[in-house]
UniProtKB/Swiss-Prot annotation:
Subunit organization: Homodimer.
Reactions that this protein is recorded to catalyse: N,N-dimethyl-cadaverine + 2,6,9-trimethyl-13-oxatetracyclo[6.3.1.1(6,9).0(1,5)]tridecane carbocation = pre-flavunoidine + H(+)
Known role: Terpene cyclase-like protein; part of the gene cluster that mediates the biosynthesis of flavunoidine, an alkaloidal terpenoid with a tetracyclic cage-like core connected to dimethylcadaverine via a C-N bond and acylated with 5,5-dimethyl-L-pipecolate. The tetracyclic core is synthesized by the terpene cyclase flvE and the cytochrome P450 monooxygenase flvD.
EC number assigned by the record: 4.2.3.-
Claim: Metal-binding is one of the keywords in the record: no
Keyword Lyase among UniProt keywords: yes
Biological processes, Gene Ontology terms: terpenoid biosynthetic process
Name used for this protein in its record: Terpene cyclase-like protein flvF
Alphabetical list of InterPro entries matching this protein: Isoprenoid_synthase_dom_sf (IPR008949)
Designated gene of the protein: flvF
Pathway the protein acts in: Secondary metabolite biosynthesis; terpenoid biosynthesis
Family per record: Belongs to the terpene synthase family.
Gene source species: Aspergillus flavus (strain ATCC 200026 / FGSC A1120 / IAM 13836 / NRRL 3357 / JCM 12722 / SRRC 167)
Any one GO MF annotation of this record: lyase activity
Amino acid sequence: MEGLRRHSVMLDCKLWKDDPIYFFKTLPPYISKYAQRADDASIQAQIDVFGKDDVGAMPGALGPRGNFAAVTFAESFPDRVAMLAYLNEVLSFYECFEKQMTEMLDATLYANPVPKDPKYDNPVWQANYKNTMTKWPKILENLDPKLGPKCVKSLVALVEGTDMEPKMAHYKTMKEYALDRTNYIAWPVACDNAEFGSQLNLTQDQLDSVRDIFLPLWTHSCYVYDYYHYDKEAEIHSTYGKGRSMINSIPLLNRLKGLSVEEAKAWLKQRCFELEKEYLQRKEDYFSENPVEAVPVDLRRWFLSQEDLATGFAIWCATTYHNHPPFGEGYAAPYEKRRKEGALWFEKVTESDQLMTGGFEVRYAN
């Protein structure tokens, strides 16, 4: 697998090695060489939806150890990692604008709406969000006529997916829950984003041939997500979700195993380390039967993409402003720093299309 990385470097060891918040012991996280573009794109998405004076109104993909796209799609091409950063920043607002997202995707929402803070019932923000939802599918298709539409299709499938909430009282095992949760946290969308970002040429048969190898990583990501999103989800649920079952491993572990919140978190963390071992064993078994030189290059790169998805997601979930203090205020420092460096963003959602086609290399003041 040596020599396959072109667009990423290992994240500084000080940011993850031996850190108890990072739930891997062997696999390191990587970050895009173009991480600044990803951050700039995320800020543009914030401006497009909330306006230049409310950047961070809903914290999305930024974090102190890496932008979501920069660490999960680390091997993406420079223009594509920026586009994915914009896309995922916008999609991270789904809990605020679920109705608008569904409408603009021409999808049908079968699940109950996600509980949200009423402050997001802002008609200007809602109109801006609808504008963002008209532009990025076109940009994806222009960048890649094959993989761009695939990303959009998987997002529609996610929106139209079965609601997990009624099932929470009936799951008998964590494995059963994790299979559904993988889809619910948009992992098929993330996989298609990764394939798009790295511009991989893979057949469906090739993807299917290695799918089971990555199942431990997918479950790992479900558990990391539940571990680090629980506190925020519990707060939102207690305020706006009364009468609904909370979709998270922690209340399920309480029902299935009688674990307290802290005991359930300890269980999830330990299980993540076990899942890493399971994945590494499956990977070793695969390459013992399939010599590396006999495996197509893009299929080998798919292994890197899957590992980046899981490791990047793990470090991001543990640190992102989406879940952790200072929350939306975390956008202020990088936004102000870039402004002092002379970076300029488009101030209206109807103008920022020009920025997208340039790979999110922001303009600078003279």
